[in-house]
């Protein structure tokens, strides 16, 4: 039986790109289905820095989604002489965001409870490469409740009665939720589940978070972007750069460096990455190309500067 590496060796770059673009189209349809309430949760697996977050943000904004951010809002305590109870606080400035509420690695269980409560009647919560939350028992239980296939999804979090931040926001210990949830991850959940199930046959107990992941995939949708090798990541990045003119019509480069790359410089950048990908200090992603482009614009001897900055 051929390994994944052996199979990839038989494919052209165009073959690989077709596979990745088919997966990307599935993601686009999955995000829309999640927004519409047909898929819960949507799990998208892919490497960091290839545009997963941007796609979710753009699609949820285009759909007119408005999400509420209690954590980013301003709150003030009641006047001690007013006779009012200590909680909840008064919200001086309620923050809402266009599109999904994007939550990264610096995230805790109480924050998840706050986000679910703030968006219990709508909005989209997107957990963005937040592996710790996906393994946390309490957070997993909240997400399990929030993704049940039923019209009314009751959430229970008893610590809401004793957590200062949740008391401040007025988060109840029990509430119903109707929130679309998207999970972006570079964890290969399906492979981890396969390994755990095999070990279970040999007598090794399955970890709790693996069982929850199985439930998430069963009730929702799991999409692998098929960027599972350095070559497939490079092929997709090159396609993205060319299709959206990421380096030749770049608002980012024009703001930070005064101009974008010329077409000739763009070709040189792609060639340099191809020749040096195996020597990069960090895994290749779209940000790598922006870093290289910035060096090319700012340094006369850019090849030497790029070697020092980007290669190991």
Locations of the language-model features?
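Walker B catalytic acidic pair
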Residues: 128-130
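N-terminal pre-Walker A segment at the start of P-loop NTPase domains
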Residues: 2-35
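Conserved AAA+ ATPase small/helical "lid" subdomain
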Residues: 233-309
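A short helix-turn-beta junction within AAA+ P-loop NTPase domains corresponding to the substrate/partner-engaging
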Residues: 194-231
């Amino acid at each position: 039986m051929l390994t994944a590496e052996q199979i990839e060796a038989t494919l052209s770059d165009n073959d690989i790109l077709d596979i990745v673009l088919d997966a990307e189209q599935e993601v686009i349809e999955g995000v829309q289905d999640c927004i519409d309430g047909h898929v819960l949760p949507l799990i998208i697996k892919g490497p960091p820095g290839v545009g997963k977050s941007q796609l979710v943000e753009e699609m949820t904004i285009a759909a007119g989604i408005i999400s509420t951010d209690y954590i980013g809002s301003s709150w003030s305590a009641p006047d001690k002489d007013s006779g009012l109870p200590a909680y909840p606080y008064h919200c001086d400035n309620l923050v809402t965001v266009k599109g999904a509420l994007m939550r990264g690695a610096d995230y805790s269980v109480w924050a998840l409870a706050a986000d679910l409560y703030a968006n219990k009647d709508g909005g989209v919560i997107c957990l963005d490469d937040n592996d710790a939350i996906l393994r946390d028992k309490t957070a997993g239980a909240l997400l399990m409740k929030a993704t049940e296939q039923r019209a009314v999804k009751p959430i229970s979090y008893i610590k809401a009665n004793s957590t200062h931040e949740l008391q401040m926001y007025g988060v109840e210990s029990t509430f119903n939720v109707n929130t679309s949830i998207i999970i972006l991850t570079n964890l290969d959940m399906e492979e981890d589940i396969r390994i755990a199930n095999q070990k279970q046959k040999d007598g090794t107990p399955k970890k709790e978070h693996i069982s929850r992941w199985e439930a998430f995939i069963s009730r929702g949708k799991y999409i692998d972007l098929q960027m599972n090798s350095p070559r497939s990541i490079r092929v997709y990045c090159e396609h993205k750069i060319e299709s959206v003119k990421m380096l030749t019509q770049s608002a980012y480069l024009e703001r930070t460096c005064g101009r974008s790359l010329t077409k000739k410089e763009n070709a040189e950048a792609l060639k340099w990455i191809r020749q040096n990908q195996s020597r990069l200090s960090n895994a290749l992603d779209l940000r790598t190309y922006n870093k290289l482009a910035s060096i090319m614009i700012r340094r006369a001897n850019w090849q030497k500067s790029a070697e020092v900055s980007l290669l190991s």
